């Protein structure tokens, strides 16, 4: 497959972008030159991937069709790419490869995309879908014929598929290290960021208390504050500008009781590469199920990930240094947490037990114990 020019249309969320890294690695390993088209706020994720040759920042707004702009960009890309891999399931995400006339356009069934994709994979409902990292990596399983003579099919491909294809076969569920996302931070970026904030390597704990999806994925402010006050290390609060107030509330509650170390609220004050550097150099990371959770896993940093309305069986932090706390796994819980995972933005029952009942002491205990592997289930009993 040497010489194949491949365009990947990236997801719009940081966590999803991180989870596409094994797809990039697969494409690169088999000789494809990978160019990623991404919205500006996720583009830095792809610049931290060694398998990506080029990153194009798309001039689009979140949720906007912007037909004229898409058509103009599609025309500018004509004859530049041999294949396109469309990670999101939306129609508008598949329009650019179609408008560019890319001969092979691979993606999942979704949102009336029959005419704009040449190769479509079956798209099971969420409760039957593999972990998202495998879901994205499976886009590389399509062995499509090419109109370009230099793109001969790979005879070693496990799929053995050819021609316009709609798969009804089960998706691959390959496990192991090949599906672990990897990100890289340069030594220069790391040291410059630490120097700016007066921090030392492994001298601070990063807390990422936000979750863009909604409050049903956020461990309570009071719990984060109590944990921050109990830690001997410096604590760095990270998040977007929208999460600045959330982090301010944590800092206000934690500061009076924090007698050791500093508490730095850097939410909205760092670039994404700087946030990567602060995470890469951290002693530990504590987060909800969020984009920065996946960043920590991809940077191989010891972490504790708190899950509420979502499921670690669907979007786990894929790292041997990750520990997952999820009360759904607590068989001694009274009453049992039968409502999780609900995948809702807000608790439909109004109690948010999946997060309220997970104490700071339980998270502190998990932080002090050595990580045991991917999806390590931490006992959540008192």
Residue spans for each PLM region:
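Catalytic machinery of carbohydrate-active enzymes
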Residues: 1-382
């Amino acid at each position: 497959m040497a010489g194949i020019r491949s365009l990947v249309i990236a997801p719009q969320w940081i966590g999803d972008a991180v989870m596409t890294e094994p797809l990039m690695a697969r494409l690169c390993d088999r000789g494809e030159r990978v160019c990623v088209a991404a919205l500006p706020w996720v583009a830095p994720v792809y610049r931290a991937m060694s398998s990506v040759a080029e990153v194009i920042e798309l001039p689009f707004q979140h949720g906007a069709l912007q037909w004229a702009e898409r058509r103009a960009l599609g025309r500018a890309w004509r004859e530049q790419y041999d294949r396109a891999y469309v990670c999101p399931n939306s129609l508008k995400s598949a329009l650019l490869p179609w408008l560019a006339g890319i001969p092979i356009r691979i993606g999942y069934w979704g949102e009336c995309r029959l005419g704009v994709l040449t190769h479509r994979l079956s798209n099971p409902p969420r409760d039957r879908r593999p972990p998202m990292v495998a879901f994205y990596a499976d886009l590389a399983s399509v062995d499509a014929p090419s109109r370009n003579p230099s793109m001969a099919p790979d005879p070693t491909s496990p799929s053995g598929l050819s021609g316009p294809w709609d798969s009804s076969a089960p998706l691959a569920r390959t496990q192991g290290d090949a599906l672990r996302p990897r990100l890289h931070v340069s030594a220069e970026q790391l040291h410059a960021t630490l120097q700016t904030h007066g921090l030392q390597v492994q001298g601070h704990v990063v807390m990422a208390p936000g979750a863009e999806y909604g409050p049903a994925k956020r461990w309570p402010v009071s719990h984060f504050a109590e944990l921050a006050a109990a830690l001997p290390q410096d604590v760095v609060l990270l998040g977007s500008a929208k999460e600045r107030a959330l982090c301010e509330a944590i800092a206000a509650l934690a500061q009076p009781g924090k007698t050791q170390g500093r508490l730095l609220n850097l939410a909205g004050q760092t670039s994404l590469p700087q946030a990567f550097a602060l995470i890469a150099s951290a002693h530990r990371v504590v987060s909800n199920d969020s984009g920065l959770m996946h960043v920590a896993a991809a940077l191989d940093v010891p972490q504790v990930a708190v899950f509420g309305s979502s499921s670690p069986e669907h979007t786990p932090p894929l790292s041997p240094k990750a520990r997952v706390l999820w009360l759904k796994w607590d068989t001694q819980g009274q009453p049992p947490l039968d409502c999780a995972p609900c995948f809702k933005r807000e608790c439909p029952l109004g109690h948010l037990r999946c997060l309220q009942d997970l104490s700071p002491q339980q998270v502190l205990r998990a932080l002090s114990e050595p990580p045991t592997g991917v999806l390590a289930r931490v006992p959540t009993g008192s």
